[in-house]
A protein has these predicted regions:
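Structural/interface elements that position substrates and couple domains in central-metabolism enzymes
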Residues: 1-209
């Protein structure tokens, strides 16, 4: 297999190399990574080198347990194609699946063995302060519907990031009105199971023309 994937600026070919060890139930996480890449592309940006914040490390809302978290695979896939990953979670202090990925949950059992470009993820640390975590990011993934994320205001997100961002909604957190506000601020929005978002985008575009 060629190693030229490192030269791909937006991960097109790499996304075709889905690790066969990943169960079909985990492909949802890989789709989130694709949506992130596509959202950034729509903004004229590349996933490689982009700063991406994943909001939610735990396996479900309002708990601090990272075991079996779908967010782990999202982070690993995005890191594989060159994204600079950050994480925020109000309930998680340490994400040991990354910090101790050589030995946790047991030596040789980490998901890291199925992905490339994983070495730097041992330095991934959970940020507890959302404004600080957002500073300078280009994409935000709402990966877990923690209470803190349910009423975030688009204007605040853009202010804290310092620029329009790509927003990926994994759990239907964003209402249509909030999505409209993101588009008005120059952001891009993608979501799982929300095919009508493109119509909202066109509606905003036509209203502003």
């Amino acid at each position: 297999m060629q190693e030229s994937w490192l030269g791909f600026e937006d991960g097109d070919n790499l996304f075709k190399i889905t690790p066969t060890a990943i169960d079909i139930n985990d492909t949802r996480a890989l789709h989130v990574a694709e949506l992130t890449r596509d959202a950034l592309r729509n903004m004229g940006r590349y996933i490689a080198g982009a700063s991406v914040l994943i909001c939610g490390a735990s396996y479900r809302q309002d708990v601090g347990d990272t075991r079996y978290s779908g967010s782990e695979l999202v982070v690993r896939r995005l890191a594989e194609i060159g994204a600079d990953m950050r994480v925020h979670d109000p309930y998680v202090a340490h994400w040991y699946e990354f910090e101790q990925q050589e030995t946790y949950p047991a030596p040789g059992h980490s998901w890291s063995r199925f992905f490339r470009n994983q070495d730097d993820l041992v330095n991934l640390r959970v940020n507890k302060e959302l404004p600080a975590a957002l500073k300078g990011v280009e994409a935000v993934i709402l990966a877990v519907p923690h209470s803190q994320y349910l009423n975030l205001k688009p204007a605040e997100i853009v202010k804290w990031a310092g620029n329009p961002v790509a927003v990926i909604d994994c759990f239907g957190i964003l209402s249509d009105d909030v999505i409209r506000d993101y588009f008005k601020l120059g952001c891009e929005v993608k979501a799982l199971g929300r095919g009508h978002i493109q119509r909202i985008k066109e509606e905003i575009r036509k209203a502003g023309s």
